[in-house]
C-alpha cells in the first residue's frame, strides 16, 4: 500500500491576529506546516495532499516549489469536509495518514508507531491522556474497544469525564475512508462535518480500530494564538537542546540556546548562553562557542573556538582556529588550522592560512592569505572599484603593518614586510620592505585656530 499523507492547512487562524495564514507562522525559523511536511517525508510518504484555503497566494509563494498536491477547500466546513476535498487524489488501496499543519512537533517515530499498530484494512487513531481534557474530543470505549469520538460541545457529563482525547491524527484505508467521508453529516452543535465521526462508522462496519500514543503530549499540541506558538517554540528548543546534550555538548544553560536548523556536535563541546544556530551546522570535538555567537550554515573543526558575539555564516573554521570576540566570518570565509581573527575583524570570500592572524579591526575580502601571516590592526583589502571586485593574494610569512590598504588586484610576495600606514597599489616582491607613507613634517610655532565667539 502506498502512504498518502493529507495535511490540513486551510484555516485562517483568526486568534493569531495576523494576515499570515496560521500554518505559516514559524517554529525555530521554519513554518509550522513545513515541519509537518518534513515529518511526512521522514515517514516515507509517497504523496502529500496539502488542503489549503485562506492565504493561498502566501502559501504557494512559500511552499510552491515542493512536491505537493494542492487541494483547495473553498469553504471551511470542518475537518471531515477538508479531507474529503482530497478524495480525487486518494486511491482505494492507499494508506491515508491525516496530519495538521498547525501541529508542528509531531515526531516521525510516533507516526511510525501509529502505522505499525494499524491492521491491514483497519483504522488507527492517535490518542493521548490529558489531566485536563477541556476542549478536546473524547475517545469513547466499550469493553476497552474504541467505538467513537465525541466532541466537547456534544459530550454528556459522563463523556466529559473521559481523559483520553482525540488528537485528530489518524491512518485509514483509502477505499473505506472515502466511503465514510461521503456519509458525514453536519447535524451537530458546530454545524460542521467532523472527521471524528468516521470512527463510529468504522466501528459499525466492523473495521478494527487501534490506537497509539505519542511519547509526549506536546507532540500533538497545536497553536491557535501567539502565546501557544511561543509555548511550542520553547518545547521545540528544549527538545533540541536535550538532543545536543545527549550527543556530547555541554550547554551552559539549556533554556538559553536558539536552534533553528540541523546541528551536529562532537564530544566535549561547550556552548555558552544565548547562542543562535541556523541552517546546517557541524561542530567538531572540543569546540568552545562563546556567549551570543551566531552560527549559520557553517563547519567548525575540532578544538576551534568561536568567542563571544561572533557571527559565522556559510564559512569554515579549521582545527584549533579561533574567531572573536565580535568577529564576523561572512559567506566564503575560511580560517585554516590555528588561524586567528580577533575583535572587529570581518572576512568574506577569503582564506586565512595556517597560523596566520588578524588580531583586530580589519577587513579581508576576496583574498587568499598564506601561512604565518600577520595582518595589522586597521588593514583593509580594497577589493571593489565601484563596479567589479578583485583578488588580493598574500603569500606565506608576510608582515602587514597597521592601517595598511591593499588595493586589489595585488600580490604580496613571500616574506615581504609592509610598513604601517601604507597604501599598496602595486605587487610586492618576496622579502621586500615597502613603505608608502608621506614624509613626516615638523612645523614649529604652530597655533591652533581660535574659536569665534557666538
Curated annotation (Swiss-Prot):
Subcellular location: Cytoplasm
SUPFAM superfamilies the record matches: Nucleotide-diphospho-sugar transferases, Trimeric LpxA-like enzymes
Region: Linker, residue numbers: 227-247
Broad class of where this protein is predominantly found: cytoplasm
Active-site residues from the entry: 360
Enzyme class: transferase
Positions that bind acetyl-CoA: 377, 383-384, 402, 420, 437
Annotated region described as N-acetyltransferase, given as residue ranges: 248-454
Gene Ontology BP, a term: cell wall organization
Function: Catalyzes the last two sequential reactions in the de novo biosynthetic pathway for UDP-N-acetylglucosamine (UDP-GlcNAc). The C-terminal domain catalyzes the transfer of acetyl group from acetyl coenzyme A to glucosamine-1-phosphate (GlcN-1-P) to produce N-acetylglucosamine-1-phosphate (GlcNAc-1-P), which is converted into UDP-GlcNAc by the transfer of uridine 5-monophosphate (from uridine 5-triphosphate), a reaction catalyzed by the N-terminal domain.
Protein name, per record: Bifunctional protein GlmU
UniProt lineage: Bacteria, Pseudomonadati, Pseudomonadota, Gammaproteobacteria, Alteromonadales
